[in-house]
Design a protein with these regions (language model features):
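S-adenosyl-L-methionine-dependent methyltransferase catalytic module, highlighting the catalytic core
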Residues: 59-66, 70-72, 76-169
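Conserved SAM-binding loop
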Residues: 2-86, 161-169
Length: 170
């Protein structure tokens, strides 16, 4: 089973099961990202593109350990996050304005349909788009390797984003 976490409005077609906290079309599982409803070692591949930065920095280690729990040994993790260091350096050098830096580093309000309105508790849905953790290549590498993954390949894509491919250790 291949699982995409935080699939949002455009679930990736290469994955079998799409997970999101919001009840969106084509989402099969509604769940928090740090308590997945999957059996231990039941997932063959896990993708989380622009998801982990939305988790509190106090919870990212436990979240990655939960993802490692559900993944079988040798399964691949495909993780994408903004490169906060790159964006901050662009801002300091005056290459981007404060509004753009805020968008990339802090996330937040969005006009996307998934972020309109309020949830069942009255909380604005755009809050789920706020960023609570920043990453750069070094911090991402340290965290992922600390949480049970090996064979890491971290690289920049789309200029301001990091992608990490890693294998669940045995």
């Amino acid at each position: 089973m291949k699982v995409e976490i935080g699939a949002g409005e455009k679930p990736h077609p290469d994955y079998d099961v799409h997970v999101d906290i919001l009840p969106l079309p084509d989402i099969e599982v509604i769940s928090w990202i740090d308590r997945l409803p999957f059996a231990t070692a039941s997932v063959d591949a896990l993708r989380a593109n622009h998801v982990l930065e939305h988790q509190s920095y106090e919870l990212v280690e436990g979240t990655l350990r939960e993802w490692a729990r559900v993944m079988r040994p040798g399964a691949w993790l495909d993780l994408g996050v903004p490169d906060a260091r790159f964006v901050a350096e662009q801002w300091v050098r005056g290459e981007i304005d404060t509004a753009e830096a805020n968008y990339w580093i802090l996330g937040g309000h969005s006009d996307r349909a998934a972020h309109r309105g309020v949830d069942s508790r009255g909380i604005p849905r755009w809050i789920w788009n706020a960023h609570h953790t920043m990453f750069d290549a070094g911090s991402l590498h340290a965290l992922v390797s600390h949480c049970g993954f090996t064979d890491l390949d971290i690289f920049t894509y789309d200029i301001r984003n990091l992608r990490c491919y890693a294998r669940r250790s045995s």
